[in-house]
Amino acid sequence: MTCPRFSRAARRVGVVGLMLLAGTVRADAPKTAELTPDRAAKADRLRRDLREMITLARDQVFPALANIRVITVRYWGGKEQKGQSVGSGTIISADGHVLTNYHVVRNGEKFKCTLADKQEISAELVGEDPLTDLAVLKLDLSELNAGTGPLKVARLGDSSAVQIGDTVMAMGSPFALSRSVSLGIVSNTERILASSGDEPQEIRFNRDQRTGIFNRWIQHDAAINPGNSGGPLVNLAGEVIGVNTRGMSFGGDMGFAIPSNVAAQVARKLIEKGEVQRSWYGINLKPIKKTGYKEGVLVNSIVSDGPAASAGLQAGDVITHIDGEPVTVWFTEQVPPLLKRLANMPVGSTVVFTYRRGDETREARVVTAKMQKDRGEEAAFRAWGFAGLDITDRMARARRLDSTDGVLVQSVRRGSSADQAEPALQRGDVIRRIDADSISSLKDLIAVYDRTMDLEELPEYLLVAFDRNGRNQITLIKPKPEKEQDPPRELPKAWVGIAVQPVLPKLARKLGEPDHTGFRITRVYPKTLAADADLQVGDIVLALNGDRLIPRGMQDGGLLQRRIRRLDIDGEAALRIARGGEVHDVAVKLERTRITPSEARRDINREFELTVREVTFFDRDENRWDEDVKGVIVDRVEPAGWAQLGGLRAGDLIQRVGAHAVRGLKSYRAAMEQVTEAEPERVVFVVLRGEGTHFQFVEPDWRPAVGEKDKVDSE
């Protein structure tokens, strides 16, 4: 092989560059190919062709993209907690079905989809399948603008034809931003996440809910970021060949997509029946690679009362044939397809397993059962202060419970009736009975809760029987929560309408008066008796009624007012002040202390998840509001509650609710009561924020939440 030759100019450039980088020169560096007009033309055609292919493929799917915004409800801390999540989806039917991930819509209560033409319309959940992490929404086509043409629909391709090295595009709305596309290649068509052993790693959304057990992902390096989940993976033919589900950025972009063949099958079943029915056997399978066997698949574990155990199979058996067809699982990548094949058998069908036990070959005829949910339904019992879960078979087995009867305590709200009971309810307790009512399911507990809270006079206590760690215990719970009280107010005391800061020795020396330590007046509150006295900002208060005031540190910032509070209201105080190097005595009439924001009366609206308080003297002074400015101040908005979703913020001054002017707490409560009774689709809040007014549009969902009927909340 001959060594390539360099031109003299090229050698000079190469030598200088290499010397700068490493101080050495390689004489055998490859020669840069000369860019001839022919090569330049070919490269330009290739770029144009690739750009055209990408553009054509993009335009096949981009119009069918949907940005999904989800209002979620989860149960934690003994109460219902709302939140928001975003994701992407693909319109797959002219009827408005949108394919996305289960984890995008998980715990969803309300769904909004933004289409390619910027229209935002509502959607409802058709069905979800946690085990494959897939879900289907259906757009409310009645909300489309008049004149809108037929929906753009993406075409699902054949994921079995995908090969390593294929060029693909990931589409979606990363970080809830506008639609985007990223380009990459397929790295692996049969990716699973394996544990350190020889079996697939089990992925879970929480302790109870598994996912991805039937999936072998398409791995690619097109960038996936939060918000891309549920979006399509597209080939250069403009076909959806996967649903982007997970992404990793360390070590280069790694994206994982559910193959379109899996997604199409699941979506079809969800649209037809609202669920994916699967057969259950009660076995766990493992590859035989390390077992010494040459064929078959190992029964790694078995559910003692499951269909497989009832047919005679045991842990340690090696299955060699299923319905007469030989089966061998050597690698972990072969486990998900086998599990999928078994699960896809019709529920109730008989499946013949040929297996080896020791030196014997045996046969088991397994009648499949319907695979149940991993995790039960949830509800919060607000007045009692806890959230509960229905118990599924899988949950009972994982917790070693005798049965699925009862309701599992998922969480307890601190300070609630359940928390203050003796003994208190705890996470993991199983409620079996309330007074004379047996509790077999969440439905039973909801019925008892609603019936109890509908009583005109609530009982003082409820007797609750529950199991904890195999022991049956009882406790008493107050069905009526303690009424929330306004913050305690200090008894009226003497006050001077000034704000001050301590003047310590170093500051006094810097001011040129080392002996004048005390309290510098930072504000004289207008419309107070102090404003009528000869007091000015910058005065340093040295003494009160002849007693010298010497602050020891910033912690003594309240010393002056504490001394004043010891005096009689409506009396008079003599303040010795330093001003311009001279000392003066100023007589100030005392008045009553003003209510602070922390002492202000409050109103908690549980429907809108909004807390407001009355306007205080100090609020008016801080915001420079005169007496004509009326309303109530937003003290707190719960995350993702109706108020927060409508744009209300802490610090807003609510001046109008709908058609009702708000002048204080009384008129605010009356306005909110009328709104709650009328249940309008939209409630307009007019608020003063900063220097201007803002109109905030709140869209309540007036449908009652399961287990949330609570009459005492408004008391």
Which ranges hold each PLM region?
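C-terminal accessory/binding modules appended to enzymatic or scaffolding proteins
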Residues: L389-R399, S403-G415, L610-L645, A650-I654
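C-terminal soluble interaction/assembly domains
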Residues: I439, L445-A447, N623-D626, D635-V683, ...
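Bacterial N-terminal signal peptides that target proteins for export
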Residues: T2-G14
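Serine-dependent protease modules
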Residues: D28-A315, H321-T350, R356-R394, T404, ...
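Short, low-complexity, Pro/Ser/Thr/Gly-rich segments in the mature regions of secreted, periplasmic
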Residues: Q696-E715
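Conserved catalytic motifs of ABC-family nucleotide-binding domains
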Residues: G316, G428, G538, G651
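Bacterial N-terminal signal peptides
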Residues: R12-A22
